[in-house]
Amino acid sequence: MNAMQRLNRIVKEKGPLIAGLDPDFDKIKQVWITQNEELVADGKLEGDPEKNRTIMGTFCQDYIEAVKESVGVIKINSAFFEAMQMEDLYWNIAMNAQMEGLYVIGDLKRADIGNTSMEYAKAYLDATSPFDAITVNPYFGTDGIKPFLDLAKKNDKGIFVLAKTSNQSSAEI
């Protein structure tokens, strides 16, 4: 079953809604501190990468648990993990979402010149990747998108090409 067939099956079963996971650590941290005082009892949080990883990982897992019965698709934004230097956690969260039966979209917004796009594509669209699909940016034209498309076809994955995004100034370009 290819990516589009999987997506169509999931939409028929659970509907067209997608849960977006954009874990803004500063917002999460405030709620977390009040609910998990034992993890921050020493008052340290800012400079403690292990506590931050625990907070981020637990929040994301709780989010997946909360949405998995209501939606069949989750779009996980990589930027929030990259900013915290937690790319490995990003992959773990994607794998966990996949194991829960969700169709996993890597919200990467990647593209570049052809050979660089191919390297991005290899990273996220490999046959063993937990991502069913990823988002790509069309700014580089077909040179930037074709490597993603070719590898997605080869490995039964998908791509979503950004068109009109939801941010306020998106109509400017």
Locations of the language-model features?
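General beta-strand structural signal in soluble alpha/beta enzymes
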Residues: 21, 75-76, 104-108, 133-136, ...
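Conserved anion-binding
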Residues: 112-173
